[in-house]
Structures are given as structure tokens and as C-alpha cells.
Swiss-Prot record:
Gene this protein is translated from: glnE
Keywords linked to the UniProt accession: ATP-binding, Magnesium, Multifunctional enzyme, Nucleotide-binding, Nucleotidyltransferase, Transferase
Sequence segments annotated as region (Adenylyl removase): 1-443
GO CC terms: cytosol
UniProt-listed GO biological process terms: regulation of glutamine family amino acid metabolic process
UniProt cross-references to CDD domains, sorted A to Z: NT_GlnE_GlnD_like (cd05401)
Catalysed reaction equations from the record: [glutamine synthetase]-O(4)-(5'-adenylyl)-L-tyrosine + phosphate = [glutamine synthetase]-L-tyrosine + ADP; [glutamine synthetase]-L-tyrosine + ATP = [glutamine synthetase]-O(4)-(5'-adenylyl)-L-tyrosine + diphosphate
Nucleotide-binding as UniProt keyword: yes
Organism phylogeny: Bacteria, Pseudomonadati, Pseudomonadota, Gammaproteobacteria, Vibrionales
Job of this protein: Involved in the regulation of glutamine synthetase GlnA, a key enzyme in the process to assimilate ammonia. When cellular nitrogen levels are high, the C-terminal adenylyl transferase (AT) inactivates GlnA by covalent transfer of an adenylyl group from ATP to specific tyrosine residue of GlnA, thus reducing its activity. Conversely, when nitrogen levels are low, the N-terminal adenylyl removase (AR) activates GlnA by removing the adenylyl group by phosphorolysis, increasing its activity.
Cofactor: Mg(2+)
Protein name: Bifunctional glutamine synthetase adenylyltransferase/adenylyl-removing enzyme
Length: 950
């Protein structure tokens, strides 16, 4: 064994330090020669021996042994038993690990062992350290909290499942260890002053075990412990019972978890009778009874993901993850295990080399191909171990430093780096050729853009990767926030029971969704809204399939959610509406104004009239469907704001009619009908709409302000089996109407209904006789109630009642009034409202309540109607502000320029409120917005109500 000249100075320095320490005096010459050789190659060996005098003294004796793995557990157990606290135990563990790793590295660098011997020692050492640390900590925890037991009082162990290379007995030199913790049965501890649940006991035990192995101390650490392969990953419980574990893998187990579980092995399994139960439980999840060709596509996607990560991180010369590297050999073996392992017991091996032998025996690959794979695997794994043993670092990337390159080449038996590099390339080329033949390369089938969206979903556990894709590949401004949203969404989904079918659909759907979302410049708004909706429907696979199978529906979903949080929330709350997205032509084409009543009757006709609950749900669904179509047309610019309000108002009127009809049937079935209706048409009942519904100005979230009227005389009774007073009948009818509107079903409420504008307000009769209504309006109503009457119209009722209401309204509005008194009362009421509702945000203009806003315009219109209708009776005709101003012009009351300014201000501010409603924003704007319009409104107010102070 000799070193090339560039490495000699490094070795000489190490030898000088060793001689000064004096420990070489007791070493045989052959060992000193080996140490000099290794000193030029491994910083780890030199530094560990130099730091540990006991190791330096005992190393000759250790190296004289051909194998030490059989005694690992007994020797470590003895040392841990002598430890009475964690600090001492942690020191023992780290010293034990470092000493044995020096022994293994020495054997590797001197080529005393085969690869199999080296991997076996590394794996046995890790298992011994994990298991004996567990045994030590279990005893300490039992002393502190009692022994965990099941319902029969039997002590319960924690089983530690080693995953990946640890489970397969193929651990590399500086590897992480992937673990899953489980225990057989729930129960509680016994033998301590206070019992705790088994789950709590094992969680604390697991935390201590991880700390004992993973924590960095003065003596270093033992292993980096990775628990992310457990059910639900980092968001899941640290430890799960068998039952919970089984439920998870049956209901939610994903393809990559199947691959990971192939190599799963319980640490110290011969100690546990419970091991067989766990093994039998997991086998059906890993190995399917049928031949499962879906594994190929899944592995191909995983490989594509890894290749993307290699590119992104700039991992050139990576012998594990690069093309033809160790991971591709593992994937080749796993393909056959997953496809045929359910039928071929020989393929259920954990070790890769024995699996490749089984593949050869079963003639699943050509013998020459298997030979290439075996040779490459042994070569690359030995190279990986030596690379890591040089400095005890977890790396699979070949060095770019010339001295390190030479050291690695010498360790592998070469005199030059180039020769090693040539052999590495040849081995990896042969592996990749087999891989492409067998599995193919998804990257050839997928465009770079599509790959980004696949990776966004596949890598949604890695913030760094996701943020890089969003920022570099998709040019997103808010990459950090959006990355967090995607990662949190996937973590939350991991806790849901999706089932294999649901998860498969979701995995197909998500890249398509990302593609649609990030095609929009406002993706930062669309992303959280769409993810929120998907979170709500994730367990309902039919909805996921609808979006997956109908690209048009998916496109419309993203478009609408991006444009409006109101729509996204509605879809999230009532996913039945997703059906409406399938046909864009229908979606953006609302029902004709005069067809709402007919469409609603047809919609309800499919439901039995006596099924009250279904009828109520159907009303709500009809409203939601129509509102969605109106909003979609609104967002698309098909409908101007005035037309949007028309549609929402006509929809509300159709629903009011249907609700009255349903309520009438339900009340009449019980009591019969009032007898005064026998010789006439209709129901003798009316619904008067006030405010927005009265003025044809409904918004998406508007309440219905209504007053109920009837014309039933006194001393009239119903004709049913259970006779009641006629006026009592109408009271029950109104109560039933409000119930149908307000009851919260699975589809929500229909409308919020406000009846406080009735005579005498909340203390008055819920249903008012029309003659009492007339008397109240003439004799008892306040001026503000007459203002409200300006915007009142009958939205449901008999012709007789309609003409009566119109007569009363006209007479009341056209009453002669004293102008100064009217001015004062209107202005005073406005001032009260402004004090109560306006100016809540000093840095914002409240569109409705602040000075110069919508309410000022409405009050102006109402004042002018009340003041001038006595001499200009045509002013009472309309209930909406726009047509009131048109009539004021026509009747010569107001100059056209002023009326047009007020109309423009009114419609502009309404438009802004409406737009902000779609965005779920408050009805306020910056102080510098609409300044000219607001000043014009204030000037008009001063002109018409000049005797009042505002």
C-alpha cells in the first residue's frame, strides 16, 4: 500500500501527530503502515483515533478480529446499563459508534472486506444502536411513567421499523436512518403514581430515542434520524398503534409508501412475538395479489422528480441520483417487486442483490442485464462508502477538488482520477440503458412546463424546491407565500381519508390545476381560493373526477375563483354547483328576466310537494345556481351592473312566489283556507318589497326587506278540519314564509328576511290588514317611513291587493307637505344615520354612509318625491333612484345636468360596491377616489336641503 506523492504530506502530518501522542508505540508495524496509508485518505479515521485515546489503545486488538457485528448488542447493552443519566448514555453511544465506524472504515480502505461484509456491519451496528438505545430508554421511561399495557394488562413494546437501506441491511457509511414507530395496542401505563395513555408514553419514549441518537454533542452524533416516512409525514403523530397504522395504509397509503415499505424491517424483531402480526398486516399493502403494472408509471414519475431535483440543485457527478446511479438500480428491482411480488415470493426480499438474483432466476431480465446491474451496484456502493468514509459526510457527489479526487481514486485501487471517472461513466451508462428499456423516461414525454406543475405537486413537502419552481420557473412574485400555501394544503390533505381512488385522481388533477392557476396573472389570488375549495371537496371523489375529466369545468373554476372570492367560497360551501361549470355556454348565459318563475316551477316540479325538506333544499340550490350564472356573466362583462341587479331582483321575486306557494300549501293543509276567498281568485295576501328589492337594486348578498299585507275581514274563519280565525291564518302563513326563508339546511339559508319596516316596526303585527296599513301611513307613520315607501312596491300578491297598495302608496307620497319641516326631518334623519354608521375609517371613504355617498343621493331622491309629488303626481310612479331622477327631469323639478351627475355618482358608486362585493371587500375606497362626484352630490344636498345643517 503506497500513496502517490501529492497525498504524502497529508499522511506525514497525521503520522507526526500520532507519534507525538505515543499510541503508535504499541502498534505492530503492519498496522502502522496501514494507518499511514489511510491517513492520506480519511480525515475521519485520523481525527477520531487522535481524539480517542482508548480507541487508539484498543485498535490493534479490534482490527485483529475479522468481524465484530455479533457482539455489537451485548457490548453496547452492558455499557448503557452502567449509565444512570442521559448525558452519560449519550456519550457512550457516540463513542461506541465512532470506534466501530473507524473499524469498518479501516477494513474498507485496506480492502479487507467485500461490499456485502461492509454493508452488513454498518447495518448491524445501526440496528444494535437503535435497539439497545430503545431498551435503555424504555426502562427509564417505565420507571418514570409506568409500564404501558393493553386491556388485558400485558406489557406493550414499541416496535421500530427501519426503512430504506437500514431495513434492507445495506446501510451506507454516513447515512440517515429512516424510522417508523408503532405499538400493538392502546391502553395505559401501570405501576406509576399516575397513569398515562400508551400513545403518550410511546411518544415521549420516541422523542427521547431520537434525541439520544440525533442530538449533536461534544462527542458528535450517532445518526441523523428521519421520521418523515411515517403516516402523514411531519404533520402526523410520532407513534401510532397497529390499528391506526393499518387504517392509514389501507385507506391512504400512497405508491411511494409502498416502495418504501418493501425494505421495511423491525429492529430487533426476534425479541417480539408481536412482529409477525405487524408483518402480516403490512404485506397486502406492499405486495398486491394481482400483477400491478401501474407501478411503472409511478416509479417513472418519481425518477423524473429526482432528475429535476438533481438539475435544480446542480448535483452533477451524483452517483446515487444521477442517470444510471444507485437509485435507478433500486427502481429497477422495485418495479419487479411491486408488479409481481404479490405472486412471486422470491421477489419479496429486502436486499437488492438477492432481489436481482431472483429477477435473473425468474428470467424477468436478460442475464447480461442483471450482471451489468450487479457489477454497477457493487462498484457504486463501494465508491459511495469510501467517499463518505473520507470525512464521515453524507454525500454521493464525486469531489471536484483534485486532492480529494486522487484520494478517492487511490482508495478504489486506481492510480489516476481519470481512470476511475471512466469506469464510473461506463457503469452508469449500462444501468441507465436498462432503466430506460424497462421503465422509460417520463421526461421524454413531458414538456418542461408540464414538468414544473408535476413537481409542484410531487415535491410539495420541500419548501426550498417549491419556492425555487415558483420563483425561477414560473416567475411568481409571492413565491414564499404561495409555496407555504401549497405545502400546507398537501400536509392538511394527508390527514384526510381520501382512499386510493381519490388520491389517484387528485394526483392527476393537481398538475392540471396548477397549470390553469399559473396561466393567470392573478395566480396569487386564485391559488389560495382554489386550494381552499379543493380542501373542502377532497374526500368527495366524484367532484375531483368531474374536474379531472372536464377541462372546461376546471378552466372555469380557476377563472371564477381567481376573479371572485365570493364565488370561490360559494363553490367551496356548495360543491354541487361544480356541475354548472361543465358547459361554459350555459354558465355565462343567465336565465331571461321573464323566465325565472317558469324555470323555478320546472325545477321544483321534480320534487314531491309533500317533501318539505327537499323542496326547501331545491329552492336554495336554484338560487345558488342562478346566482353563480349571474356572477359568472358579471365577471365576464356580459352583464352591466344595472342588469345584474335586475337579474338578482327577478330571481328573488320568483323565489318569493314559490315560497308563498309552499307555505300556503303547508298551512292550508292543516287549517283549510279563509272562507272570504271562495268567490274570488288569489290568496288575499301580498308581499311588499322595500329598499333594494323594491328598487330593483339587489346585490349578491342583499337581505329582503318586506312587509306582509292581507285583506281578510274580521270574523272570517278557515274551512279546514281545524278551524282558525282568518287573520290568524295569515299570521301563521307569514311565520311559515319566514321559516322557509331563514331555516339553515345543508344548502344554507334562502335569504335573510327583515320585516321591521311594517307598521309600528318590530312591535307591530307581522301581517297587516291593508286598511290598517293605509290608516297607519296616513296618521301614524314617521317621515322616514314615508321615505322608505318611496322605494316600496308589491313583489307578490293579488291584483286587488296590488291596486289597493298602489293607491295607498300614491296617496301617501302625494300628500302636501310643509317644505321646511320636511327638509329638517330628512336632514336630521340623515345626520343620525351618518353619526351612527358613517366615518368609521378616517382614512377611507365609505361609499354608502359618508357625506357625498349613496345614502345622500337616496335621501335626496326621496325628499324630492315627498316634496313635489303633490303637484307632480307622476313622481310616485317609480321606486328606483335612476328612474326617479329621469322623472324629475321630465317633470321640470331638477335640471338635467344635476340629475345626470347624481345618476352618474349613484351608478358609479353602486358599481364599485358591487365589484368589491365580488372580491369580499368592504364598501369603502381611498379618500382621493370619486372626489368630483362626491362634491357634486354634496352641492346638490346643500341646494335642496339648504335650511338644514349637514
Amino acid at each position: 500500500m503506497s500513496l502517490p506523492s501529492p497525498l504524502i504530506p497529508v499522511a506525514e502530518l497525521a503520522m507526526q501527530n500520532a507519534q507525538q501522542s505515543g499510541y503508535l508505540e504499541h502498534w505492530p508495524q503492519a498496522l502502522i503502515t496501514q494507518f499511514q496509508f489511510i491517513s492520506g485518505l480519511s480525515k475521519f479515521v485520523v481525527e477520531t483515533v487522535q481524539r480517542d485515546a482508548q480507541l487508539a489503545e484498543s485498535l490493534p486488538e479490534m482490527l485483529a478480529q475479522e468481524s465484530r457485528q455479533e457482539a455489537y448488542r451485548t457490548r453496547l447493552a452492558e455499557q448503557l446499563q452502567a449509565c444512570h443519566d442521559e448525558v452519560a448514555g449519550h456519550r457512550v453511544l457516540r463513542q461506541f459508534r465512532n470506534r466501530e465506524m473507524v473499524y469498518i472504515a479501516w477494513k474498507d480502505f485496506t480492502q479487507a472486506w467485500s461490499l456485502e461484509e461492509s454493508l452488513s456491519h454498518l447495518s448491524e451496528l445501526a440496528e444494535a444502536m437503535i435497539f439497545e438505545t430503545y431498551q435503555w430508554q424504555y426502562q427509564l421511561c417505565c420507571k418514570e411513567w409506568g409500564t404501558p399495557t393493553n386491556a388485558q394488562g400485558e406489557a406493550q413494546p414499541m416496535l421500530i421499523i427501519g426503512m430504506g437501506k437500514l431495513g434492507g441491511g445495506e446501510l451506507n457509511f454516513s447515512s440517515d436512518i429512516d424510522l417508523i414507530f408503532t405499538y400493538p395496542e392502546n391502553g395505559e401505563t401501570q405501576g406509576a403514581r399516575r397513569s398515562i395513555a400508551n400513545a403518550q408514553f410511546f411518544t415521549r419514549l420516541g422523542q427521547r430515542l431520537i434525541k439520544a441518537l440525533d442530538q449533536q454533542t461534544f462527542d458528535g452524533f450517532c445518526y441523523r434520524v428521519d421520521m418523515r416516512l411515517r403516516p402523514f409525514g411531519e404533520s402526523g403523530p410520532l407513534v401510532m398503534s397497529y390499528a391506526a397504522l393499518e387504517d392509514y395504509y389501507q385507506e391512504q397509503g400512497r405508491d411511494w409508501e409502498r416502495y418504501a415499505m418493501i425494505k421495511a424491517r423491525v429492529m430487533g424483531r426476534e425479541m417480539y412475538p408481536e412482529y409477525q402480526e405487524l408483518r402480516q398486516m403490512l404485506r397486502p399493502f406492499v405486495f398486491r395479489r394481482y400483477i400491478d403494472f401501474s407501478a411503472i408509471q409511478s416509479l417513472r414519475r418519481m425518477k423524473s422528480m429526482i432528475s429535476s431535483e438533481v438539475r435544480r440543485r446542480g448535483l452533477s457527478n451524483n452517483i446515487k441520483l444521477g442517470a444510471g446511479g444507485i437509485r435507478e438500480i433500486e427502481f429497477i428491482a422495485q418495479v419487479f417487486q411491486l408488479i409481481r411480488g404479490g405472486r412471486e415470493p422470491a421477489l419479496r426480499q429486502r436486499g437488492l442483490l438477492v432481489t436481482l438474483e431472483a429477477i435473473k432466476q425468474l428470467q424477468l431480465l436478460e442475464e447480461a442485464q442483471v450482471c451489468h446491474l450487479v457489477e454497477a451496484y457493487k462498484y457504486l456502493r463501494r465508491l459511495e462508502n469510501l467517499l463518505q468514509a473520507m470525512a464521515d459526510k453524507q454525500t454521493q457527489t464525486l469531489p471536484d477538488n483534485e486532492l480529494e479526487q486522487l484520494a478517492l481514486a487511490v482508495a478504489m485501487g486506481y492510480s489516476q482520477w481519470q481512470a476511475l471517472q471512466n469506469d464510473v461513466q461506463q457503469h452508469m451508462a449500462k444501468v441507465h440503458a436498462v432503466f430506460v428499456t424497462l421503465i422509460g423516461d417520463e421526461e421524454d414525454e413531458v414538456s418542461p412546463v408540464e414538468r414544473h406543475f408535476n413537481e409542484l405537486w410531487d415535491m410539495a413537502h420541500n419548501p426550498e424546491v417549491i419556492e425555487q419552481i415558483l420563483q425561477n420557473d414560473l416567475a411568481c412574485q409571492n413565491a414564499a407565500t404561495m409555496s407555504e400555501q401549497i405545502i400546507q394544503f398537501k400536509a392538511d390533505l394527508a390527514k384526510k381519508t381520501l382512499g386510493p381512488r381519490g388520491r389517484e385522481v387528485l394526483n392527476r388533477l393537481m398538475p392540471k390545476l396548477f397549470s390553469a392557476i399559473f396561466a393567470d396573472a392573478d395566480a396569487q389570488f386564485g391559488l389560495p381560493r382554489v386550494l381552499h375549495l379543493l380542501h373542502n371537496i377532497a374526500t368527495r371523489t366524484t367532484y375531483l373526477e368531474l374536474l379531472d375529466e372536464h377541462p372546461a369545468a376546471l378552466t372555469q373554476l380557476v377563472r371564477l375563483c381567481t376573479a371572485s372570492p365570493m364565488i370561490s367560497e360559494q363553490l367551496a360551501r356548495y360543491p354541487i354547483l361544480l356541475d354548472e361549470l361543465i358547459d361554459p355556454q350555459q354558465l355565462y348565459n343567465p336565465i331571461a328576466l321573464d323566465a325565472y318563475r317558469t324555470e323555478l316551477r320546472d325545477f321544483l316540479a321534480r320534487i314531491p310537494e309533500d317533501d318539505v325538506e327537499q323542496q326547501m333544499d331545491a329552492l336554495r340550490q336554484f338560487k345558488q345556481i342562478c346566482s353563480l350564472r349571474i356572477a359568472a356573466a358579471d365577471i365576464a362583462g356580459v352583464l352591466p351592473v344595472m342588469k345584474v341587479s335586475d337579474h338578482l331582483t327577478y330571481l328573488a321575486e320568483a323565489i318569493v312566489e314559490a315560497v308563498v306557494h309552499q307555505a300556503w300549501q303547508q298551512v292550508a293543509e292543516k287549517y283549510g283556507e279563509p272562507t272570504h276567498l271562495k268567490d274570488r281568485e288569489g290568496k288575499g295576501f301580498a308581499v311588499v318589497g322595500y329598499g333594494k328589492v323594491g328598487g330593483w337594486e339587489l346585490g349578491y348578498n342583499s337581505d329582503l326587506d318586506v312587509v306582509f299585507l292581507h285583506d281578510c275581514p274580521v270574523n272570517v274563519y278557515t274551512d279546514g278540519k281545524k278551524e282558525i280565525d282568518g287573520r290568524q291564518f295569515y299570521l301563521r302563513l307569514a311565520q311559515r314564509i319566514i321559516h322557509i326563508f331563514s331555516t339553515r339546511t345543508a344548502s344554507g339559508i334562502l335569504y335573510e328576511v327583515d320585516t321591521r319596516l311594517r307598521p309600528s316596526g318590530a312591535s307591530g303585527l307581522l301581517v297587516c290588514p291593508v286598511d290598517a296599513f293605509e290608516e297607519y301611513q296616513h296618521n301614524d307613520a314617521w317621515t322616514w317611513e314615508h321615505q322608505a315607501l318611496v322605494r316600496a312596491r308589491m313583489i307578490y300578491g293579488d291584483e286587488h291587493l296590488a291596486s289597493e297598495f298602489h293607491r295607498v302608496r300614491h296617496q301617501v307620497l302625494a300628500k302636501p307637505r310643509e317644505q321646511a319641516k320636511l327638509q329638517k326631518e330628512v336632514a336630521d334623519m340623515r345626520a343620525k344615520m351618518r353619526d351612527h354608521l358613517g366615518g368609521k375609517k378616517s382614512d377611507r371613504f365609505m361609499l354608502k354612509q359618508d357625506q357625498g355617498g349613496i345614502t345622500d343621493i337616496e335621501f335626496l331622491a326621496q325628499y324630492l318625491v315627498l316634496n313635489y309629488s303633490a303637484e307632480k303626481p307622476k313622481l310616485t310612479r317609480w321606486c328606483d333612484n335612476v328612474r326617479i331622477f329621469e322623472t324629475l327631469i321630465a317633470q321640470g323639478v331638477m335640471e338635467e345636468a344635476q340629475a345626470m351627475l347624481l345618476t352618474q355618482a349613484y351608478t358609479t358608486m353602486r358599481d364599485e360596491i358591487h365589484r368589491r362585493n365580488l372580491l369580499n371587500l368592504d364598501a369603502d375606497v381611498a379618500l382621493d377616489k370619486f372626489v368630483a362626484l362626491r362634491q357634486g352630490v354634496s352641492k346638490a344636498w346643500q341646494e335642496w336641503l339648504e335650511s338644514s345643517t349637514i
